[in-house]
Amino acid sequence: MRILLIAGGWSEERDVSLSGARGIHAALERLGHQVTLFDPCRTLAGLLEAAQAHDFAFLNLHGQPGEDGLVQALLETAGVPYQGSGPAGSFLALNKAAAKEVFVRNGLPTPEWVFLPAHPGADWEPPFAFPAFIKSNNGGSSLALHRVSCPGELARALDELFTRGGEAIIEPAVEGVEVTCGVLGDEALPPILIRPLGAGFFDYASKYTPGQAEELCPAPLPGEVTAKVREYALRAHRALGLRGYSRSDFILTPAGALSLLEVNTLPGMTATSLLPQEAAAVGISFDGLIGRLIELGLAAHGKQQEKA
């Protein structure tokens, strides 16, 4: 097939997107496809025409545009199938505050939060005790994620976040280990337990620098905990109206309680990314994962794959 690989964009996660795109590009060619890279580095001008000249679009955008549903909406307009979730589910999952409302309504445990549409002022404090995490309401890859332990740190973090623009969300820091679990098709994959080796939490450097975090897959957890993680990941995927694949991030407390943090609709696809590790744990190679995502994308759009 003629595949348009859409990567790059103008968000702060541009470099991560392009890094992952290199591996995806190679995998698509190994699978026999003709691949063209489209990088909407400043605008989406030309995307509609480029997509219509191809049989399929493979998205590897992070943040905005891409995870917010805009590119998906344009592809729907072009009538070109693509992998992953549609416009509505993508927008909902990227908006962390809105997604947490969905979690609560569907009985999925998530830390309490305060949504900040604008800077609340230098003297503002949250209605819960420190420490807390404050982050962009519409970003990913742990960019602009701050752990704050006092009013002074909070004030500095707020200034930095709102200098970048956009919205923020703050929630109490739940102590425990980080666990992530992907969904592929209609099944949850084996979860991964994450132990950052430098930072106290899974920040941007830990996520994308080899050797900065210990990632254990399958996670060495009791069977009932593993089952609950997979159940919650699948429930969150369905509650948000997602399709194809996703990855849910959790905190597991020392008492064994789970807190759902967020759901990613376009999980990372770099050499250190989590979803490919989970797929490998059930015997799916990286190329096999890319091929499966294409199959799921075609099926979601009522298409069948022809020979490459």
Curated annotation (Swiss-Prot):
One Pfam family of this chain: Dala_Dala_lig_N
Binding-site residues for Mg(2+) 2, renumbered to this chain: E262, N264
EC number(s) reported in the record: 6.3.2.4
UniProt-listed GO biological process terms: cell wall organization; peptidoglycan biosynthetic process; regulation of cell shape
Pathway(s) the chain acts in: Cell wall biogenesis; peptidoglycan biosynthesis
Domain ATP-grasp, residue spans: 100-295
Keywords: ATP-binding, Cell shape, Cell wall biogenesis/degradation, Cytoplasm, Ligase, Magnesium, Manganese, Metal-binding, Nucleotide-binding, Peptidoglycan synthesis
Transmembrane segments: none
PROSITE patterns the UniProt entry points to: ATP_GRASP, DALA_DALA_LIGASE_1, DALA_DALA_LIGASE_2
Record's GO cellular component terms: cytoplasm
Cofactor(s) needed by this chain: Mg(2+); Mn(2+)
Reactions mediated catalytically: 2 D-alanine + ATP = D-alanyl-D-alanine + ADP + phosphate + H(+)
Protein name: D-alanine--D-alanine ligase
Source species of the chain: Oleidesulfovibrio alaskensis (strain ATCC BAA-1058 / DSM 17464 / G20)
